[in-house]
């Protein structure tokens, strides 16, 4: 909640929660769960940062500058934890690593800018797609 919604849940977020929870009721839930497990495994065991330079298509990166999400943070030492999830730095590094990429930083937005501030998210997305 801290990095996703600025520690404040709003009723307009309910539909996104219901969407995610609804997958568990679908007949294809085992497939969805398996894909989620594979994605989680990739995040933990196969860093893709080294492959960013291989991306050939124009790429838009939209980040919230308040985001400090860091998977595995609780397993790291305190000094390493302080260096994790610094998206205001990671966004710039990622943009430099991906050829033909554009970075949009949304101030005071957390991990889910498309939910937390849809209007600020959708404008640069549409502009990018229309190029």
Model-predicted regions and their roles:
Residues 25-96:
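Conserved serine/cysteine hydrolase catalytic core
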Residues 7-14, 131:
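Surface-exposed helix-capping loop/turn segments at secondary-structure junctions
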Residues 88-131:
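Catalytic active-site module of serine/aspartate enzymes centered on a nucleophile-bearing elbow/loop
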Residues 5-6, 25, 99, 130:
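Residues at helix-coil transition
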Residues 12-19, 30-31, 93:
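Exposed alpha-helical structural elements
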Residues 8, 59, 102-103:
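Secondary-structure boundary/capping signal
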Residues 1-10, 19-24, 36-43:
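Helix-loop "lid/cap" segments that line or gate small-molecule binding pockets
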């Amino acid at each position: 909640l801290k990095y996703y919604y600025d520690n404040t849940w709003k009723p307009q977020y309910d539909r996104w929660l219901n969407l995610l929870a609804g997958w568990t009721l679908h007949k294809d839930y085992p497939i969805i769960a398996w894909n989620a497990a594979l994605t989680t495994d990739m995040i933990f065991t196969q860093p893709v940062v080294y492959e960013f330079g291989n991306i050939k298509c124009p790429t838009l990166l939209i980040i919230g500058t308040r985001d400090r999400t860091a998977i595995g943070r609780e397993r790291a030492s305190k000094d390493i934890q302080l260096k994790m999830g610094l998206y205001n730095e990671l966004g710039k590094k990622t943009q430099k690593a991906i050829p033909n990429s554009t970075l949009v930083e949304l101030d005071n937005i957390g991990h889910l800018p498309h939910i937390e501030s849809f209007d600020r998210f959708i404008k640069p997305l549409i502009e990018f797609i229309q190029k």
